[in-house]
Amino acid sequence: MKAEQQHTPMMQQYLRLKAENPDILLFYRMGDFYELFYDDAKKASQLLDISLTKRGASAGEPIPMAGVPFHAVEGYLAKLVQLGESVAICEQVGDPATSKGPVERKVVRIVTPGTVTDEALLSERLDNLIAAIYHHNGKFGYATLDVTSGRFQLVEPQSEEAMAAELQRTSPRELLFPEDFEPVHLMTGRNGNRRRPVWEFELETAKQQLNQQFGTKDLVGFGVENAMLGLCAAGCLIQYVKDTQRTALPHIRALTYDRQDDSVILDAATRRNLELTQNLAGGSDNTLAAVLDRCATPMGSRMLKRWIHQPMRCITTREHRLDAIAELKEQALFSDIHPVVKQIGDIERILARLALRSARPRDLARLRHAMQQLPELAQTLSSLGNSHLKSLATAAAPMDDVCELLERAIKENPPVVIRDGGVIAEGYSADLDEWRDLADGATGYLEKLEEEERDRHGIDTLKVGYNNVHGFYIQVSRGQSHLVPPHYVRRQTLKNAERYIIPELKEHEDKVLNSKSKALAIEKQLWEELFDLLLPHLARLQELAAAVAQLDVLQNLAERADTLDYCRPNLTKDPVVHITAGRHPVVEQVTSDPFIANPIELNSQRKMLIITGPNMGGKSTYMRQTALIALMAHIGSYVPAESATIGSIDRIFTRIGASDDLASGRSTFMVEMTETANILHNATANSLVLMDEIGRGTSTYDGLSLAWASAHWLATQIGAMTLFATHYFELTELPNQLPHLANVHLDAVEHGDSIAFMHAVQEGAASKSYGLAVAGLAGVPKTVIKNARQKLSQLELLSAEGSQPKARTVDIANQLSLIPEPSEVEQALASIDPDDLTPRQALEALYRLKKML
């Protein structure tokens, strides 16, 4: 006997469905619950903190079981999706009344972290991306898809560093990778990684899948036909999404090539250090996005974050945005646009659910409400003169046909789901209205029947009622049940009453129930037909949503510029960063003290600033604010300064702060050096580089040597615009030795045992570091500070005398190297081939080697 045949028919059905979905949790509908069995039950009980019970037996052992109520399933799904789990939803599709054996069930949808579209499972102000990654010969193909909007992009990073930066930028909720993927360390620490068969990434299969999706013969029109690695990833991705959604994907209409040359490249360390959308603790407070995002709609908020993470190099695009912001700011139109756009809401995600035919009645009611706001938006935008805003206003023009259809079709306040009807408005369908009238007319008939029966038999407690179990009934109190005539048939006995049925009432019940079920069937059919009527408008609706989202971002940036006193940056192609009275956009909002604004000047004659000054003096803030102002200028935003001229930047690098990477076995110093190596290899003359405290993780001489050499290389070989903060005062000599360098410092003033930080940037090098004063502020015991001052005096005296402490002599030139470099003699010996030498040449070589010793 097969193992499956040892189970009940219901469990046999479960095992067949589970075999089709072996790697994900299966929610198996049984009545009012979704049940899980075996290992799924054990896993779900731990993840969801629900009870683990038992049911029946398998091979003599009870079957583990856990369940969740169907009406509360969204909350449990949300928790599982947040944990990176995927769930197959199995529903009863057969009719229990006509089924022989178990009710027919099938998996109707698969919920995965990257493909969810339900509002309850999504963060409304964050993109929800699914991605696929492919690797070949050291290069990568990477595709991302936002199922909730239809945005489908691919990119081809040329190195692991670039690939890591893309993963950091996009933060996919789900990541597909082939079974033979080698650089698996890229996925360390990520939830939602999915291993897929290698054949799903085959190029020809991918092209076939994509052409089928877009209804095209080739991909030339999308400009991606030569992106072979990216297409391999995109093909796997579209197939996976089709498999999980179990439906067509009409809202995914194009695949775009995200060319990295078009944007300012930010590596993973830079995104982390600048705290763009996530702070160093992993939260969203005190980030650039937290300050800039006052968007009226979630879709506007998501677009703004995409802009922040992908600054544009194209000056024309940025000038268009700045021109639009200028007009909205000067005319204070943002205050008029904000409330109207807020009423439009997040139609982008509603349209995705419409495309997937998973939209609910209230989705379409919200879409109707959004359509009703468009005439007012058009009126508000009618006075605009800016060409970019005019084009957005045209794209967001009213769609009267869609609005009229939704107004006719959907009730004012529809229920949450279509299941029980009551969604389609009166007057939309004469057929539906007729059956509804028949069902609703029952109320008057029942009231009349109740009154007649009560008068006819003299039973004043007689009532006509209805429940789902027994249908219609006549109820009489126990005290008057003796008055009931013989043709009353008892249906139910209660504690204080009896319930009866009569032929006339039974006949009416059959008629009413039939009319209700008929009306519900017609309503569900009309609901499906409504999708068919709306889908031809999908492309136009998506364009409208994108235009409204961009209007929202622009009005938001105009409001921020006005409220926070930002200025319009002057954009130029020259490598220059000239800022007057610049401020850190985040720090100035969270500090209780007045923020000290500072200038900066970087240009072709002043490429590097050596920044010195005390800890807590503001060096890191000064560096970060420069990078953030440059980044804001590259998204087309106003900036926190009195004035700013920002040149075209190709990359922003930061080497600020570090911590041990314990998972990879890398020390603080190793992390620091890895980031430094990345900068020295990839920076160009058009890059903005922030280097903070290079070399602090090792000995003084090692650190000083590395800091000096790094600064020297950046200045002489690369010529990048560089802010180089250091505690090594020896580096302040560099501007005296090399052109295009300058010293600046942040100062402090000591008052006895206290210290006041000025936070003002001044020309020249700092005179001292104030390290002991900072230690005192931190609470280091005064005795320790006193001993430190004595030791400092001794060291300064020895340094002035030109000697080293006798306790330990450091031979700088002969430090132990992890990879010993060959001596001059060894190099000379290695270059000699004895078999090719005459006796005379051999003797001459020996004398040369002797001289080298």
UniProtKB/Swiss-Prot annotation:
Which GO molecular function entries does the Swiss-Prot or TrEMBL record give?
ATP binding; ATP-dependent DNA damage sensor activity; damaged DNA binding; mismatched DNA binding
Q: Which residues bind ATP?
A: 613-620
Give Gene Ontology CC terms: cytosol
A Pfam family recorded for this sequence: MutS_V
Instruction: State the InterPro entries in the record.
Output: DNA_mismatch_repair_MutS (IPR005748), DNA_mismatch_repair_MutS-lik_N (IPR007695), DNA_mismatch_repair_MutS/MSH (IPR017261), DNA_mismatch_repair_MutS_C (IPR000432), DNA_mismatch_repair_MutS_clamp (IPR007861), DNA_mismatch_repair_MutS_core (IPR007696), DNA_mismatch_repair_MutS_N (IPR016151), DNA_mismatch_repair_MutS_sf (IPR036187)
Record GO biological process:
mismatch repair
**The family this protein is said to belong to:** Belongs to the DNA mismatch repair MutS family.
Q: Which HAMAP family match?
A: MutS
Q: Give the function comment from the record.
A: This protein is involved in the repair of mismatches in DNA. It is possible that it carries out the mismatch recognition step. This protein has a weak ATPase activity.
Q: Under which name does UniProt file this protein? A: DNA mismatch repair protein MutS
Recorded source organism is Vibrio vulnificus (strain YJ016)
Supply the source organism's classification: Bacteria, Pseudomonadati, Pseudomonadota, Gammaproteobacteria, Vibrionales
Q: Which gene encodes it?
A: mutS
